[in-house]
Amino acid sequence: MTPMKRSVQTQVSEPFTESWGEESLPELPTEQSLTEYSDLKEAPSAHTLYVGHLNPQFSVPVLACLLRDTLERLEMPVAREHIEVVRRPRKAYALVQVTVRRDTLASLPWRLQTALEEHLILKELAARGKELLLSEAQGPLSHREEEEEDSGLSPGPNPGSGVPLPAWPTHTLPDRPQAWQLQSCQGRPSGVCSDSAIVHHEIVGKDQLFQGAFLGSETRNMEFKRGSGEYLSLAFKHHVRRYVCAFLNSEGGSLLVGVEDSGLVRGIRCSHRDEDRARLLVDSILQGFKPQVFPDAYTLTFVPVISTSETNVPLKVIRLTVHTPKAQSQPQLYQTDQGEVFLRRDGSIQGPLSASAIQEWCRQRWLVELGKLEERVKVLTMEKEQLQQQLQQHGPMSCTCCVL
């Protein structure tokens, strides 16, 4: 390169250098700002999670409880009112409203697989021969229904069109109004919503008890159990069979666990997981009763107990209420899933009844029904005689002319 050309190049490059020097270069974002930007970009957002291949043999409340426990083990806690379960005769699925990061949602399938391998998830939650299907719900979800149909399940309506789904809010969970959360729980059966649910640091439910309060004495329709130690895992299932069967064969009643025989409220340690297990246990036992016991025949609630002592596990009173059986056209006697029959007496349970005792019970019930029918026939007979007398009094007078 010649000296002249080199000087020209120097003269041309200097103005650029001066101009860049005069204007300050834009500052690069600092590490703190990048961190804030990434946090803002990865902020939790609301998503609708589709859960397929659920076991249709369980009822909707039990599926909701088991699914909530499963999501907790996957480090994705969800309130029960944010779980919408759709159950068909041979298929079931759920739509869950979650507020998580995108990366958490993307890692959900492999975390589910890891939990299944470590036996942290109840296998019975999935349909027989199937595995749980977790994915983000987008659009009408028709392709997921086709996957279930291809996998052997019976076809059903499209969940996006045939079932009216709730309009999930698009903003995050902390900004949701409390009225919406209460409304989503009020529209469901009473067995689904727990009295111990907490929304905005307030107990949702009209019932709460104070430790040491006096509830009264046991009656024919009220039974108290202290429930200490390993009661929930050992004795609770036997008491469910005995007392529910006895209440069904009488005028109904309530079993309260966490109350002493004297009527003082103590409460039992009952976590959300224990609550779910209790619901599953009661549901599985009552499904084996004969005649069939429908969900509207009983109510299982968990009443929070307010205590002055600080405990990590909340105290609750388990209340299993059997409603007064509807009048039947003929006497009906319930038996447990083990074929045993119990009756409620004043302050005690009679049973299991022998064959002769059951026959005597049926004979007495039929005598009562026969007496009612005889009384009804007597009333109808009297009404018939009165109507005949009225017809004779108001009837036309006939005259007969005799010619001699």
Curated annotation (Swiss-Prot):
Q: Does the keyword Calcium apply?
A: no
Coiled-coil annotation: which residues? 365-395
- Per the record, where are the segments of Low complexity compositional bias? 152-165
Please give the Gene3D superfamilies that the UniProt record associates with this protein: Schlafen, AAA domain
Among the Pfam families in the record, one is SLFN_AlbA_2
Biased region (Polar residues) positions are 7-16
Residues covered by region (Disordered): 1-31, 139-170
Q: Which GO terms describe its molecular function?
A: ATP binding
User: Which InterPro entries does its entry note?
Assistant: Schlafen, Schlafen_AlbA_2_dom, Schlafen_AlbA_2_dom_sf
Print the keywords alphabetically.
ATP-binding, Coiled coil, Nucleotide-binding
Enumerate the residues binding ATP. 258-265
The UniProt similarity line reads: Belongs to the Schlafen family. Subgroup I subfamily.
| Record-given protein name | Schlafen-like protein 1
